[in-house]
């Protein structure tokens, strides 16, 4: 019985395609540079966005599509979007609109979304097994304090999904030893102005008041690179951080930094 079930399962997973990789993408700096890096290595890249029902996803997907259009490469496959709803699990949580997002000075350890990488990678693994994609790349960085972002977790999960899907899958975190500033330096030449890293974006602009905006602004500063980001308000835009304020005022909108549209970037 066990052998018969094992033979039948082979119909569901495809033979691995050498030289192909699935990149988990969010539209932010890390995943943008990850895609560019994989393309430069000569790999066929399948970008995959996992939609979980979080408040920033509509703006994030729009930014991601603009970014991928600018990365002109024959090895870049069309964006795939799959759903792993988490709103029923998280309930009234800041990530689902149940409250304001973490403020500008909130430490990274306090913005954890429990089980997020487990949900993303489990469904991504099924997606890859059905298409013969042998590995998943994720843009985890140095210093990530969360339990589902460790090398031990990735090894254990890869082993589990490979066993459960009867497929040989790898989970790769090539930026695990890099800071966000390192990633920005690595991504010079890519249209990083098209990326979005904000917990409460406003019509394509970064709010400038959340912890994601702080992390982004500080990373450009630490990289010694000009920050092309349009911030609506707050310290990232060169202004104060209003206590409890998350919506940009009319004056803050007038101060928004504008950047010229990015030209398409050919990744060889």
Q: Where are each of the predicted segments found?
A:
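Short, electropositive, low-hydrophobicity segments enriched in small/polar residues
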Residues: 30-32, 143, 212-215, 228
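Charge-dense, low-complexity polyampholytic segments
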Residues: 136, 200-206, 225-233
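ATP-dependent adenylation/nucleotidyltransferase module used to activate substrates
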Residues: 2-190, 247, 256-259, 266
């Amino acid at each position: 019985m066990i052998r018969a079930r094992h033979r039948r399962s082979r119909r569901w997973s495809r033979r691995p395609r050498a030289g192909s990789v699935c990149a988990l993408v969010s539209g932010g700096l890390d995943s943008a540079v990850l895609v560019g890096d994989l393309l430069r290595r000569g790999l066929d890249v399948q970008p995959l966005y996992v939609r979980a029902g979080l408040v920033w996803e509509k703006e994030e997907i729009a930014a991601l599509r603009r970014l991928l259009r600018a990365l002109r490469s024959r090895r870049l496959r069309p964006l795939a979007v799959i759903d792993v709803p988490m709103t029923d699990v998280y309930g009234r949580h800041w990530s689902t609109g149940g409250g304001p997002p973490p403020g500008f000075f909130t430490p990274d350890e306090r913005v954890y979304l429990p089980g997020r990488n487990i949900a993303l990678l489990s469904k991504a693994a099924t997606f890859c097994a059905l298409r013969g994609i042998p590995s998943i790349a994720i843009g985890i960085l140095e210093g990530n304090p969360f339990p589902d972002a460790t090398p031990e977790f990735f090894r254990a999960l890869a082993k589990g999904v490979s066993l459960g899907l009867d497929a040989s899958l790898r989970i790769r975190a090539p930026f695990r030893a890099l800071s966000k500033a390192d990633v920005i330096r690595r991504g010079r030449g890519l249209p990083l102005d098209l990326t979005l890293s904000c917990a409460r974006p406003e019509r394509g602009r970064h709010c400038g008041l959340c912890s994601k905006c702080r992390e982004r602004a500080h990373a450009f500063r630490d990289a010694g690179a000009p920050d092309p980001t349009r911030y609506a308000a707050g310290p990232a835009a060169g202004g104060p951080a209003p206590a409890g304020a998350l919506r940009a005022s009319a004056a803050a909108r007038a101060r928004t930094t504008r950047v010229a549209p990015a030209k398409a970037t050919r990744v060889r």
